[in-house]
Amino acid sequence: MRSIAKLMQDWQFTGPDGKTILVELPHTWNAKDGQDGGNDYWRGTCTYSTTFAAPAFDAASQEVWLQFEGVNSSAKVLLNGRNICTHDGGYSTFRVHVSDLLAKDNQLTVEVDNSINDHIYPQKADFTFYGGIYRDISLMVVSRNHIALGHFGDTGVKITPALKDGKADIRVETLVEGEGAVSVELQDAAGSIVARAEGADAQLHLDAPHLWDGVKDPYLYTCVVRLSSDGTVVDEVSTRVGLRTFSVDSRNGFFLNGRPYSLHGVSRHQDRKGVGNAITREMHDEDMALIRELGANTIRLAHYQHDQYFYDLCDQYGMVVWAEIPYISEHLPNGRANTISQMKELICQNYNHPCIVCWGVSNEITISTKDKADMLDNHRELNDLCHKMDSTRLTTLACYAMCGPFNPVAHITDLVSWNLYLGWYVPGLFLNNLWMDFFHLVYPGRPLGFSEYGAEGMPNLHSSKPRRGDHTEEYQAKYHEYMLRCFDRHKWMWATHVWNMFDFAADARDQGGEPGMNHKGLVTFDRKTRKDSFYLYKAWWSDENFVHICSKRFTDRTESEMEVKVYSNQKSVALYVNGEKVGEQTGEHVFSFRVPLTGEIEVKAVAGDCTDTASFRHVDTPNPSYKLVKTKSKSANWV
């Protein structure tokens, strides 16, 4: 049977300054300079080196493999001074067979390169390309006869369910390196065996399958594949399986298991304050908990392949996922092979996840208008590749705001979504309504989604009269209030994804008074502060009873009468000022009260069993800390 040992400790890291220090994995060298602005974070080659003793294994009957789950963006791996593999693409798993190269004591060196180049994606985008070994490295010992480890970094097991007339047929294809007999069993959530089959191309059948049914009932089976040699089990792979159907209709939106299922959710970048992309499982768990609290049922995992652990969480909690490769912003004529290899790895490594319904081939690729013919051909090749490798899912892409509805790139994939910031980068929130209606009028048979929309919001910036571009928490909330009403009038949209769930690093930016950051998140970069907009979405999407008073951080006010805005998913909200009830409203999501402001007041909102409190005070002059002080900057703010 296979054994796995992590190689996470005692790495010698030689960084940009040429000095060598001791680090633990996960690690990135851009955790600080990739988040502080200036578009000057260091990109180049750094070296990681460690020693390990050869694992106990029988060379006649076993093999040893190294597994790398994320090295950004190019890796050159050396074992005992010998170059054993290279890998281009910083977000996917790769493995290398090392049995014949091991000594008693071994030196493993990984040269990691995130340099600017013309053939590996991403090269231009509104996020930081952190260099480093930021996911796990493992040493694996397996039988010489084993379930394949050398196929695009996948598990060697491909599971394809088909549902019809209330029954399920499940095809389980197993790649074997060596020889042996394959047996397959399907276990229900309680661990009971509900189906069995034999062979490397096995068929399982269920008469009454329990469906994976989104966030309300994300039921998962477990498929156990065993490889036996001479009657002895020598290898085993377990995979969670969700059984579901889905479809998309341009007039009625997304369907899950045959019924309408409105997809409303968020996009997610994986990085964190102070650690970059070198995040832990506990951080993944916290991200998922916040997304679930919001009430989202879909996640766009942008703009690259995320950690397998997070896809597992999406399976577990019923999130419908858009998965994509980092073919982004600027087409590279020399980069086609890299888009193909990254897509093959994305599909192979994630094929078995029931959460995933579509493969994203690119994002805002028309920002650069050069090499248009080659770019379109690259898209067609990717689209065809996705369909060839996976006939069970759809393809999509995210179009740049300035990519008009008639652009041919928007009509290659099965689905299309737009990144539109009307009301933020462009004046006029009302234009969102017009844009959706126009596209639907011209292309009534084309499913349309919003892959990005949002506005910057700083929890420390405030205004009683918020305006586009002021970066206040209030304008961000005002923007999202409009967008939610807009989507409610366009229920035929196949999916909408807020940009972004969390603030994230973009070292080229200098906006909102904090260089190096994109502040469109509903939650701050450190995950410690839920902005008011977070609670707005919770009011629309969540079933968890709550009430929230907005603008709590906007304490000092100059007006003699102020608005107290309240978000809640309850039908009635009562407001108290200094203990006296001043009003009660019935409605949905957003409740607004006008109250006089003299001196300091204590405000309490009550909705059912839920309460929230806030304090405000009248001041004679505006608090200068609430207003953005704009400075001249050479940083390239993304538009």
Kindly give the residue locations of the regions a language model identified.
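Substrate-binding/catalytic cleft of secreted carbohydrate-active enzymes
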Residues: R171-E173, M288-I291, T298-W540, E544-S560, ...
